[in-house]
Amino acid sequence: MISGAPSKDSLLPDNRHAADYQQLRERLIQELNLTPQQLHDESNLIQAGLDSIRLMRWLHWFRKNGYRLTLRELYAAPTLAAWNQLMLSRSPENAEEETLPDESSWPNMTESTPFPLTPVQHAYLTGRMPGQTLGGVGCHLYQEFEGHCLTASQLEQAITTLLQRHPMLHIAFRPDGQQVWLPQPYWNGVTVHDLRHNDAESRQAYLDALRQRLSHRLLRVEIGETFDFQLTLLPDNRHRLHVNIDLLIMDASSFTLFFDELNALLAGESLSAIDTRYDFRSYLLHQQKINQPLRDDARAYWLAKASTLPPAPVLPLVCEPATLREVRNTRRRMIVPATRWHAFSNRAGEYGVTPTMALATCFSAVLARWGGLTRLLLNITLFDRQPLHPAVGAMLADFTNILLLDTACDGDTVSNLARKNQLTFTEDWEHRHWSGVELLRELKRQQRYPHGAPVVFTSNLGRSLYSSRAESPLGEPEWGISQTPQVWIDHLAFEHHGEVWLQWDSNDALFPPALVETLFDAYCQLINQLCDDESAWQKPFADMMPASQRAIRERVNATGAPIPEGLLHEGIFRIALQQPQALAVTDMRYQWNYHELTDYARRCAGRLVECGVQPGDNVAITMSKGAGQLVAVLAVLLAGAVYVPVSLDQPAARREKIYADASVRLVLICQHDASAGSDDIPVLAWQQAIEAEPIVNPVVRAPTQPAYIIYTSGSTGTPKGVVISHRGALNTCCDINTRYQVGPHDRVLALSALHFDLSVYDIFGVLRAGGALVMVMENQRRDPHAWCELIQRHQVTLWNSVPALFDMLLTWCEGFADATPENLRAVMLSGDWIGLDLPARYRAFRPQGQFIAMGGATEASIWSNACEIHDVPAHWRSIPYGFPLTNQRYRVVDERGRDCPDWVSGELWIGGIGVAEGYFNDSLRSEQQFLTLPDERWYRTGDLGCYWPDGTIEFLGRRDKQVKVGGYRIELGEIESALSQLAGVKQATVLAIGEKEKTLAAYVVPQSEAFCVTDHRNPALPKAWHTLAGTLPCCAISPEISAEQVADFLQHRLLKLKPGHTAGADPIPLMNSLAIQPRWQAVVERWLAFLVTQRRLKPAAEGYQVCAGEEREDEHPHFSGHDLTLSQILRGARNELSLLNDAQWSPESLAFNHPASAPYIQELATICQQLAQRLQRPVRLLEVGTRTGRAAESLLAQLNAGQIEYVGLEQSQEMLLSARQRLASWPGARLSPWNADTLAAHAHSGDIIWLNNALHRLLPEDPGLLATLQQLAVPGALLYVMEFRQLTPSALLSTLLLTNGQPEALLHNSADWAALFSAAAFNCQHSDEVAGLQRFLVQCPDRQVRRDPRQLQAALAGRLPGWMVPQRIVFLDALPLTANGKIDYQALKRRHTPKAENQAEADLPQGDIEKQVAALWQQLLSTGNVTRETDFFQQGGDSLLATRLTGQLHQAGYEAQLSDLFNHPRLADFAATLRKIDVPVEQPFVHSPEERYQPFALTDVQQAYLVGRQPGFTLGGVGSHFFVEFEIADLDLTRLETVWNRLIARHDMLRAVVLDGQQQVLEQTPPWVIPTHTLHTPEEALRVREKLAHQVLNPEVWPVFDLQVGYVDGMPARLWLCLDNLLLDGLSMQILLAELEHGYRYPQQLLPPLPVTFRDYLQQPSLQSPNPDSLAWWQAQLDDIPPAPALPLRCLPQEVETPRFARLNGALDSTRWHRLKKRAADAHLTPSAVLLSVWSTVLSAWSAQPEFTLNLTLFDRRPLHPQINQILGDFTSLMLLSWHPGESWLHSAQSLQQRLSQNLNHRDVSAIRVMRQLAQRQNVPAVPMPVVFTSALGFEQDNFLARRNLLKPVWGISQTPQVWLDHQVYESEGELRFNWDFVAALFPAGQVERQFEQYCALLNRMAEDESSWQLPLAALVPPVKHAGQCAERPPRVCPEHSQPHIAADESTVSLICDAFREVVGESVTPAENFFEAGATSLNLVQLHVLLQRHEFSTLTLLDLFTHPSPVALADYLAGVATVEKTKRPRPVRRRQRRI
């Protein structure tokens, strides 16, 4: 202040006001650059140049001076006179002092103290993460400046100055969501690119590449890299400056300051000093304190307003933003010259509108026009720099806030719209203190704004963005770009040298081509129009649709042509004269030529006339499908009447309603249809009618008169009749015949019902052309097998149906290799969505066939558009409508009747001569749907569509309550009307749910107990639950953390109270000294009171004086770091909610660690065990409020899968995610969100409801919770409730902060709880308490009433046809309403999102078969309630689970084929394929404990493993070996050794050896002492690994495993585990590792002994021999099995001495894996089939022949015992699977899956046996199949080799004899993980690595790009040239192969036969194959040993496999002997082949 001047407080009010007004006037003159004479009291300040930003600054000035004005008031009257009146009306007495706050009040940034982000900064930081939608970019500006003479040293010096001046340039952004100041900023100086001497071409290329690299740069803000300057030096002293700035550190308003200061420094000027005592951290703390009350008000304001907000801009997209992997933005710029801008802003000011709001209104209007909206939610950027301190004005920081503005875009003049928006803005701006970021988060939580508000408007008018200087040393801004995460289009307006720059930065990849360009052009035209035409402000916005688009519409709709003459039926009678003997129609009963058909029709017409039918009468046809329908139709038309087809398949009452509405004169029926008659209307059977005399003179009608009336569903409950003229229908039929050359050679399969208008073309189109109808009977309408027979028998050439039926045909034919579709030359589909896959699938049968997609409406004569499809482009999202048919037209219209621009969705209108006459006898509905405009008569379809730029029409679905379901058009209103008439329905509404294939869902509010059934308690549930509990286990009652330890922590660590110190009765000074925020006062007072009780402080009356005492040293380890956490919370630097995630201090952890928690959980486990025995099934336990699942994990660890099915329900999505991760390894655990849909899905299912410290927390939020729990429980269920009676000391340091210091208000004693239970009709049977933790056993009521949807469906079926009865019925207490009281349909639809779809109440399985299937699906798929609509594969099923399912169904007495499940994956459809069979009396599982330690036979696979490891075999000399290396921190070797020995004792096969060709379990083995290695370097560890990884374990000596440990200096311990597949298969290894992990983690929890052994399993009679049918099936396949992949090899396999395996491994992250499985399910493929097909695609590209066979490893455990999946053993079987490439990848994959399902049906025949048969068939020694696929998917071991385990996998390898390449796949931690183990020496260097890269790339592509599934294989992986198997090297010829044939003597043959009998125990004839005679591979090993003893010393094991019969072997031995005698060469090392 000036010395001597009076302070404001000393001025009298009048003088005070006068001084303020004078200051206002002077500052306005200066700011607006006016003279005093130019500024009048009535001058419009906005017109004078006052913009939005300056207005906000003036508002701050007014408030700082004590005038409580609002922004709305300043905008309302922007003149000095009006503002003066406002000042006079407000008292200025409460003006704020201009004094600076105390420096210590607002702390500065320091290196050690991070501080919070603003909401916008937080959004930027999280949004930039790569996993976020449109993430992977920062909020980033890249700008180039072009100038002269700037040097790097000048620039660097200036930036260094700014670094010292602005602390925000030192900021780094931490992963925990905070920012921190770095004393040394991250800046490496200016990077210089010297291009002064480059030629022009290379210089430009360099600059382009530099721009490409820098323009979308993601700066490393986490280390403080927030800006960067690079300088390019150019010739002639020119330069280009490249600037990168992350907007986390500065907003656009700070740019001006930044560049101004930088330019000043470069110009040699000095900068004024700034106040360093107050920085951005100070500002944020200051702002938080001042704004807190305003923030609460603002939050309430926005939450109240939220439900009324309009949608965000709805622009056409080509892809979902979440699928876009990279963000690359494009800039568009319009520069408005100063003079034109002056005109624009001046005119805006005249209407009291700022230029900013005028621009925002124009921008919104363009968005609205292309989004079909009248209002939208615009994301407006605010530069919300509050002048809290003088230092703020010169501060560089991000002050950004966002405001979501409800913007009016249409329906008024431009000026009025802008004023309305400005008024809304001023009101919203006053409530900006609850940021738009937070509002958006709330809106997303409500699932209303899935993309947020992705279109942003930013205005920086009134200042330059880059510098306010006229001359800038930096240069002029030229090319630039910005990015903001999650933003689609970002609009920026700013001034530059008097001009205004309007820029759009957009992510064009999201939008259709040229769309953004079109929008920007429209925006520029609006701005130019408002600049040029003053009157435009007083008019609505001019239409923005481009003229070029209108011209294209006119062209494609120019369809006029001559109109066909005559009546609809006349052409058929002309054909009858021309070709009377030609076939006209055939069905199962009749086959008529044209003469017969027309004769019958004439006779029937004659009888109609006799019955009194007059011209124009309506005659109903109600009969089942057949040739008689044609007679009836033609007869009615000949009689001059109108035919009215009325379906027989609907309730009689509805038929009668149609008859009455249509004034039907007579009903034509079929005499076989007993129920077709009418009570009130005459009926006539066509069979009787054709006995009459034919009509003599057919009645002639005008072509414009009606031909037929088709009734469709009506919204009022009454069906509506569409009246179609002869001319309209005839035009369509003739057009289609001409377009597709339909003629006498054609036959059509007439599938459509007569009341479906596709039948009109079948009859009048095909017969008019001389073709014939092949009619299906009523029972064949859904039977593709019958269709194929009819198509083949009658040579059908045309197909005309809804898409679903054609899909059914293709699926059938693909599955059964039926080539029937090749007969169809033309396929016409319409009536519903057409799958993108259908054209290619059809052309796989007939490449040159015509595939025609058509559309239209019954109201427009069958069809109105057609599109012939050749190839389906990858970018298509659906099959389009195409173009209008002849004499027909289309419009796409918005709500105001305007044509929609290209790509914009609107209602489809149809015009032309096909438009119906209207609805019969319903003028009101006719007027609503049929519009007569000056140009044309139009039918409003209610369909949504859009135009493409070339004039193609795309169909997008329905907009009203009329839907298409299964091809039927249904008015939802008719269903709602029928529902409302049912007794017991209070209110109801109906929706069609699903994206394309719709399903009807009814939401019903029932009355009283309507549609109810009563359930009673299961007698197996106990009446007294405490009888199951037993005695509560003993426990220590001392808490983990004592009160004394808590007191120590509070006194010394947190409050820092020293002995003798007096805190004072008022805690505020203490809080101030510790910088504790005022809101924590209640908490601090509670702590002080606690310290008094602990005798650490004296009472408050004595000032809380600290008592004498010393700090204890035995601090609990959980306190480590907790003081820092609490200090940050108390100071406001951290949110207290972070405690919820604290591993030690969350309320959940504190409750879990309470000493009574473990005994209670153990008691609950005991109850579950006892109850499971009583129920003879797993107990269904639902935990409500599961949190992160800590207690659940402890419970599940004490139970097995046969005892519990656990469902955890949790409100918090974050905690739900944590719980899913924690419980991922428990197959019986499922987790769901706590919401209405989940509750409905689990209704009446829980045997036990568990509430662990949750009831007190949930009850206040939901007072009806106890009633809800009743709905979850079965009658008589147990509520197991655990609740604290009082707060524990440790909770003072956690829970207290989360409950506002008053947690006890939520806690109750046992009497209070018992009263609550009793009031809710529960019976509290028992209670207990230990150390303050209470436990209640509460019984639910024994009787419960529930709603039964089937009752309602049955009632509806009496009023509606079957296709109109909703498949889903959802009972609700009330329908949800919007803010304006209407039904909230969006809320209802959200119940059926894909996530909620599985949880919604739906059509329950019906009948015993469906229920049996449903029960098995629930068990196998680990899912909740399945419905009749549930799809096995979409629910997670795969081929493995499918195989298990068929086996279990067989045990239940049903014949089930895998192929049926693949073809019919919907539950109801699959159940219909099952056939009841007589199952032999099931043999009980034989357990032979007395034979447990006796030898038993090896399986075929075990024998192959054993024989194959012999050193002489090709690729032998290795074991079937699995090796894995783990690292483990803080290894407890004793514990590990104990656990391993327990597992040895538990599992017999860990004690097994192989002796004399048999396996045997040892009864006793010595304790395993784990060998240890002390190692000093990682290299030593690697040497140990290498030695162990490739060892061959001796199966004859125990142990046949190896487990060793290595200690490496400074590293975690290493654990090496070797297992042999000879004794353990892959699943056994998963079980073993899971039990090892669990045992080591929980050593006190012992696993129970197993009641069954592997030996028992193998001895079961059902496993002893393969099914004869399977043997025959494989025998029939032998000639069609191709060889193994012919891959390029480095050498022949037999040349590899000892194979050495190498590994490649990879993974598909959980997101992509989930997406890939979802795509697989949608394509009805299992995940394994997809992976096999991807792998085969790669192999096929490298193989010499594209077809080949793979060897599949199956872990084939037959479900012979409930605990079969807990035992170890080698259950492996092998199965061959062939790959045959098809037209596309998808087709190939589907074919592979079809073969897979067939092969699995016959998997009881091993691949080993099949390969032997192949060898015999091909007369070769062996047919190897050395390329192996091993899938462990579906085994629910998500913890297998998981990195989260204590045993963390580091490295692994497997090896198998005779295998070249083994691809293994498994799931772990939500990911797909896979390995390739291969013989390294076998393949050229780098080849397998290249194949692996291709596989990984293709796998990712399949997950990301759905269109790639349709591509040919060569487009995915190009074939490799010269791929072949050692093609350049001739095979070696061994001497034995070239020896002469010498016959053996009979004695040798006899000797071999005798030896065989001795070894095998069976006889063999001389010429009989050893294997066919009963030998195994192991027998041949034994035979080899025996024959060597008989003087055949040169005989090798391979010789027996090469010459596998006595005579062949004897012949060979004779030849060898001869050669030995004559040549006596040096012995040749024999090469062995794989068996």
Swiss-Prot record:
Keyword Mitochondrion: no
Entry's Gene Ontology molecular function annotations: ligase activity; phosphopantetheine binding
GO biological process: amino acid activation for nonribosomal peptide biosynthetic process; toxin biosynthetic process
GO CC entries: cytoplasm
PROSITE patterns, A to Z: AMP_BINDING, CARRIER, PHOSPHOPANTETHEINE
Repeat region (I-DR), residues: 114-146, 310-321, 378-390, 454-462, 477-491
UniProt modified residues of type O-(pantetheine 4'-phosphoryl)serine: S52, S1439, S1977
Domain called Carrier: residue spans: 15-91, 1404-1478, 1943-2017
Name under which the protein is recorded: High-molecular-weight protein 2
Taxonomic source organism: Yersinia enterocolitica serotype O:8 / biotype 1B (strain NCTC 13174 / 8081)
